Amino acid sequence: MMATCTPRKRKRYTLNADNDDSLLTDISSSKLRCAENLFPSPNKKHNYQSSVQKEDKSCSHQLHFPSSPLKTTENSRFSFANHSSLFKPAMSTVSFYSKEKYYLNPLERKLIRECRSICLATESGDKPIPSVTENIQRKPVCTKKNKKKQKSLTAKYQPNYKHIKSKSRNLKNSKPNQVTYKPVVDQENSCFPAKNYPNSPPRVLSQKIKPQVTLQGGAAFFVRKRNSLKKLPLEDKPLLLQKNLPEVPEGAPEAKQIPKSLLVDEKSSVKVQNARSKNEEKLRKNPSGAVVSSKECNLDKHDFPSENSLDENKTISPESVYPIFNVSSVNTKRPEEQSSVGSTACTNFLKQTNVPKNINSRDTNKGGKDQLVIDAGQKHFGTTVCKSCGMIYTASNPEDEIQHLQHHHRFLEGIKFVGWKRERVVAEFWDGKIVLVLPRDPSYAIKKVEDVQELVDLELGFQQTVPVCPDKTKTFLFIDEKRVVGCLIAEPIKQAFRVLSEPSASKECSRAWRCSDVPEPAICGISRIWVFRLKRRKRIARRLVDTVRNCFMFGCFLSTNEIAFSDPTPDGKLFATKYCNTPNFLVYNFHN
């Protein structure tokens, strides 16, 4: 391209002084036209598009270069004569990067800016619009303000602003070269600082992050609270609240985007804090001099919005509104001018209020039973009854367990009945049988009777004595499932004594009772009658006595007036009264 244009040296045309003014005016007019084409007004959009199309066509014509340098000179002469302008090169002054934009010199840019500012001022009338230079000068001021805010606010809780600068050569924007600040409206608040809303989570890279909850436990919570109360007096609280409030201009457009509910909540919170500060001042500045914890909180009804969910009867009390943060009368320092009367009144009042709190729970449980054994959920705990031997003992007690093992082994061996070859079965029942053992029976039978008699004597508390007629005693054993569950020892007697009836008022079973001195004739005396504990209430004792009455004397059935009981226990007395159908049954002394 350059080879075709530079073989010859071009001649410089001299210009007259008269033509200088015309050339300068043409240059300024052409520059103004270019500025108007580059920055069209909103009313001249259609004209601008047509002009752009014409310029594109002219540029396309200019790109077709002439074949010889002579023609280029001729074309330049024609253009100079017609347009009365300076030298125009063959190549159009198109920007290197974009073919649609023209390159402008610094002087041309300055003229365009001045012309553009004048045109915008004339179109808008009295409303001045800041130019690009003015906006550039205002930028450092905005950054300074933001830097000051960063010092006062933490980086986490600072509101996010998007700095958007409109492009100067954008064809669609009606107002170019303007700097706009659009705040990012969060879900809750954007204009007010985050310190007034501690519940709102902080944002990091436009993402919500829940702050880690740290609870001060123990004495650290109260120590920190006291230090804060000492450092910050109560009179300075409303001033601090006013300082913490953000400075919002009256004509700011961002204030319109704030929901009304947030403003109402903020006002109500400020009023509640002011009411708390007033109540705390009343605690300290009491005219009587005595520190009295006033629990009355005077709040205006208009401070809170009415809601349908709240009942009309419910009144707002200081206990319902964070009682932890109320200043207690004990922690506050008393003034130096406090009188002795006020101090006594304060102590008396505090004693009256703290009486129910100082009551110890242990004092109320003094009348209850003392727990001597720790109940840790053991399976075997407390008093238990052995199902096989019937002994009552305390589990988890080593002494009782040892005694239980000894008694259990001895008892099971004593009541165990294997069976004999020659059994003297006196009566048979569906649940067992009764076996009679005489003194002349084999030794294994007599030995078994002695073992059972020893167990019976231990359980009944009977003295081991020698009977009057050992050769005539008869032992009746009730056998059930190869075990001895009942035993009756009978012996012949000659006389017995009648038990005197007691008044109906005292029907308690006691060992001491009275009997008559007049003896009565009797034939059979029942020295011992015993039934296994787990087999009682099954008519075993009754069947044993019936068998004795039938078998004690051959060919004779004894009546209830011919049998007597020897020193019965309370249970034996009830049984004798029930069996004989009278409390005046016969008893005898087996020692005689």
From Swiss-Prot:
Keywords: Acyltransferase, Cell cycle, Chromosome, Metal-binding, Nucleus, Phosphoprotein, Transferase, Zinc, Zinc-finger. It is found in: Nucleus; Chromosome. GO terms for cellular component: cell junction; chromatin; chromocenter; Golgi apparatus; nucleoplasm; pericentric heterochromatin; site of double-strand break; XY body. One of its GO terms (molecular function) is protein-lysine-acetyltransferase activity. One of its GO terms (biological process) is regulation of DNA replication. The modification Phosphoserine is found at S41, S85, S309. Coiled coil: none annotated. Its main location: nucleus. InterPro entries: AcTrfase_ESCO_Znf_dom, ESCO_Acetyltransf_dom. PANTHER family: N-ACETYLTRANSFERASE ECO, N-ACETYLTRANSFERASE ESCO2. The N-terminal region seems to be responsible for association with chromosomes, thus excluding any involvement of the Zn finger in this process. This is N-acetyltransferase ESCO2. It comes from Mus musculus (Mouse).
